[in-house]
Regions:
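A surface-exposed partner-binding patch
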Residues: 1-99, 149-152
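Generic recognition of short, well-ordered alpha-helical interface segments
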Residues: 34, 85, 134-137, 141
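Intrinsic-disorder-associated interaction segments
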Residues: 63-66, 70, 128, 132-136
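Amphipathic protein-protein interaction modules
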Residues: 92-119
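A short, surface-exposed interaction/processing loop segment used at functional sites
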Residues: 112-135
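Charged phosphate-binding loop/patch that engages nucleotide di/tri-phosphates or the phosphate backbone
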Residues: 138-152
Length: 152
C-alpha cells in the first residue's frame, strides 16, 4: 500500500517525514518488540499522520526535530495503566479510549489486528483500561478507515 500517496490525495491530512531504518530500530529497542512489516512500511513512508486531532502515531520528524510519540505513549501507558507489552499505542484519546496494535517481541509479524480499549475511572478514582477488543483485522484496514475521515 502506498500510504503517502493516499494521504497526499487529500489536503486535509498532515504527515511527517519518512523514518529510516535506524529510527525504526530505535522504536523496537525502546519498547522491546518487533514491529509488524506493514507498520514498518507505514513508518518508512510517512512516519506518522493525523487528520485534525485523530492520529496514527509513529515517528514525528521535521527538518531538525524528531520525536517518538509511539514510544512515549506506549511506555507511559504501560506504566500508568499497565498496558500489555503485546501492544503499541496508535492513538490515545486522553482518559477515553485507546487504539492499539498487536506486536510481538519474538517474531516479526507481517500484519496484526488493531484493537480498541476504553479507558475508565474506577471507584477508587484510578484510571484503568478495559480488555482490548478487535476493531480491524489489519493495519491496512485501520488505515483505510482513517482515510475515510477525509471524505466527510
Amino acid at each position: 500500500m502506498n500510504y503517502l500517496k493516499q494521504l497526499k490525495q487529500s489536503g486535509e491530512f498532515e504527515y511527517s517525514l519518512a523514518a529510516n531504518a535506524e529510527e525504526i530500530k530505535h522504536i523496537e529497542e525502546e519498547l522491546g518488540i518487533l514491529l509488524p512489516e506493514v507498520y514498518v512500511n507505514f513508518l518508512s513512508e510517512c512516519g506518522s499522520c493525523n487528520y485534525g486531532d485523530v492520529y496514527i502515531n509513529g515517528i514525528y520528524k521535521e527538518k531538525d526535530t524528531i520525536s517518538y510519540p509511539v514510544v512515549e505513549l506506549t511506555k507511559q501507558l504501560r506504566e500508568d495503566l499497565h498496558l500489555s507489552e503485546d501492544f503499541i499505542v496508535l492513538h490515545y484519546e486522553v482518559d477515553e479510549f485507546l487504539t492499539l496494535y498487536k506486536v510481538s517481541n519474538k517474531i516479526r509479524l507481517k500484519d496484526a489486528k488493531v484493537f480498541e480499549a476504553e479507558v475508565f475511572c474506577n471507584d477508587k478514582g484510578e484510571f484503568k483500561i478495559d480488555k482490548p477488543t478487535p476493531m480491524f483485522d489489519s493495519f491496512e484496514e485501520y488505515f483505510e478507515d482513517f482515510l475515510s475521515l477525509g471524505e466527510d
